[in-house]
């Protein structure tokens, strides 16, 4: 079973997830938590060691598409990898690919940060 944890930026997802992780360990629940792959975004750097997340926040129009594709692909890979190696039957996942497409990609399109073809 997969349960996605969604919410606006700054809504308390990280706090909830931290509590959930501690509770799962304490109660020995057959579940795990898969966090958003922020560390992967921070590893994707140019020759100046500026990562893709920093680039996105500095110039959303220029890096909007590159960041959203990177976010989507890294999320899919992390979820697939962790579920394959997990022994648990329940997975709590921070954000879903549906949020990447229907919220962040759409918001970037509506604000002109990415084009229709992108």
Where do the protein language model's features map onto the residues?
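PAPS-dependent sulfotransferase catalytic domain
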Residues: 52-92
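Hydrophobic anchor at the beta1->P-loop junction of P-loop NTPases
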Residues: 3-5
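Hydrophobic positions on the alpha1 helix immediately C-terminal to the Walker A/P-loop
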Residues: 16, 20
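ATP-dependent NMP and nucleoside kinases share a basic, alpha-helical "lid"
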Residues: 79-118
């Amino acid at each position: 079973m997969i349960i996605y944890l969604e919410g606006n930026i700054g809504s308390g997802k990280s706090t909830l997830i931290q509590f959930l992780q501690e509770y799962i360990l304490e109660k020995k629940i057959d579940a795990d938590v898969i966090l958003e792959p922020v560390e992967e975004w921070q590893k994707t750097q140019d020759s100046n060691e500026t990562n893709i997340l920093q680039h996105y926040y500095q110039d959303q129009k220029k890096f909007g598409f590159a960041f959203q594709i990177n976010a989507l692909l890294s999320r899919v890979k992390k979820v697939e990898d962790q579920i394959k190696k997990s022994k648990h039957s329940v997975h709590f996942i921070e954000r879903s690919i549906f949020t990447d497409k229907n919220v962040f990609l759409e918001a970037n399109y509506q604000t002109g940060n990415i084009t229709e073809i992108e």
